C-alpha cells in the first residue's frame, strides 16, 4: 500500500507488496524490491536499488 500522503516519482520502480507510509519521499531513478517497507518521513534518493524484504525506518535517507 502506498499512502496518498507519500511522494513517489512516476519513474520509480516499485515491487509487489511494498508499503510506503505517509510523507515518505521516493525519487525517480529508484528501484524498490518486493515486500519492502518504507516508513514515514524516509527518503530514497536517485540511484538507490533495494532488494527484497528491506525495512527503511523513520527519517532515514538512502542514496
Which sequence ranges carry the predicted segments?
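A structural motif detector for beta-strand N-caps
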Residues: 6, 12, 17-20, 24, ...
